């Protein structure tokens, strides 16, 4: 299949690799960007795959506490201009109130607010989407919002201040699991295979590569889990060590960031500004 300039551009942004390397990787995978990233990690052509899943949509994350649970809601729009619009925010908060009143599913929320959403789209001039709703149970909770774009709720057995600090850590460090032991075996095995191939591409024999990587897996599971990460407020200690000192535990967390996994369509800048001006006069 023909590789487009847009595909090459996306792969460059997500890996930091050169244009020719990206084009070559995409050609080898018939345009499969995710497979290209994995192959480039193995070959060392990419600086990192850490930019995968870059934020590519606008909107807001809202949080509200209910009876023994909290709700996190994501509502999207096309530009950050509309994300700050009072009509958009009023709509998002109305959806949040209904969600918090009874743990309403995303499908039911979308259906219930479809007519209101369509009217708002006509008024504002941008597409709007009630995208995600998440519920988290727990008697002891703390939440943290970083601007309008990141929302975190943490549950556990700890004082409110400790949980709040952990929530701030989750917002900044993006752990995927609570504990290293929570990382699924298939995730560990996939990373192990990637690391072994990287080591072998560096000239290490397979037996030595496997021994080297065995030690790296402990580091990997620590890096992707909350309790294994260095605490942002006290980097010489892990979050797990801080919790142990305080006699505290974290049982669960949810972190939402605006636009995760959404590819934002590139718009002509002049046309976008004109649309924003027109909307403001409506």
Curated annotation (Swiss-Prot):
PROSITE patterns: EF_TS_1, EF_TS_2. It is found in: Cytoplasm. Residues 79-82 are annotated as: Involved in Mg(2+) ion dislocation from EF-Tu. It comes from the Bacteria. Signal peptide: none annotated. Keywords: Cytoplasm, Elongation factor, Protein biosynthesis. One of its GO terms (cellular component) is cytoplasm. Associates with the EF-Tu.GDP complex and induces the exchange of GDP to GTP. It remains bound to the aminoacyl-tRNA.EF-Tu.GTP complex up to the GTP hydrolysis stage on the ribosome. It comes from Shewanella loihica (strain ATCC BAA-1088 / PV-4). SUPFAM superfamilies: Elongation factor Ts (EF-Ts), dimerisation domain (SSF54713), UBA-like (SSF46934). This is Elongation factor Ts. One of its GO terms (molecular function) is translation elongation factor activity. NCBIfam families: tsf. Belongs to the EF-Ts family. Disulfide bonds: none annotated. The keyword Cytoplasm applies. The lineage of its organism: Bacteria, Pseudomonadati, Pseudomonadota, Gammaproteobacteria, Alteromonadales.
């Amino acid at each position: 299949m023909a590789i487009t300039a847009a595909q090459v551009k996306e792969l460059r942004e997500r890996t930091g690799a050169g244009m020719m390397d990206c084009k070559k990787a995409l050609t080898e995978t018939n345009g499969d960007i995710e497979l290209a990233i994995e192959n480039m990690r193995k070959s060392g052509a990419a600086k990192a795959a850490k930019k995968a899943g870059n934020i590519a949509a606008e909107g807001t994350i809202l949080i509200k506490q209910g009876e023994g649970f909290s709700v996190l809601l994501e509502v999207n729009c096309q530009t950050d201009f509309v994300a700050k619009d009072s009509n958009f925010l009023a709509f998002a908060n109305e959806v949040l109130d209904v969600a918090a009143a009874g743990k309403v599913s995303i499908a039911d929320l979308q259906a219930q607010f479809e007519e209101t959403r369509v009217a708002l789209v006509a008024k504002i001039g941008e597409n709007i989407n009630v995208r995600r709703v998440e519920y988290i149970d727990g008697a002891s909770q703390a939440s943290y919002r970083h601007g309008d774009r990141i929302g975190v709720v943490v549950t556990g057995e700890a004082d409110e201040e400790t949980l709040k600090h952990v929530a701030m850590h989750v917002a900044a460090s993006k752990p995927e699991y609570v504990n290293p032991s929570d990382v699924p075996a298939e995730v560990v095995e996939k990373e192990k295979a990637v690391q072994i191939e990287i080591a072998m591409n560096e000239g290490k024999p397979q037996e030595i590569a496997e021994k080297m990587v065995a030690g790296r897996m402990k580091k990997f599971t620590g890096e992707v889990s909350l309790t294994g990460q260095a605490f942002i407020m006290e980097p010489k200690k892990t979050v797990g060590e801080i919790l142990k000192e305080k006699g505290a535990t974290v049982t669960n967390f949810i972190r939402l960031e605006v636009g995760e996994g959404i590819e934002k369509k590139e718009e002509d800048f002049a046309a976008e500004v004109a649309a924003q001006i027109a909307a403001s006069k409506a």
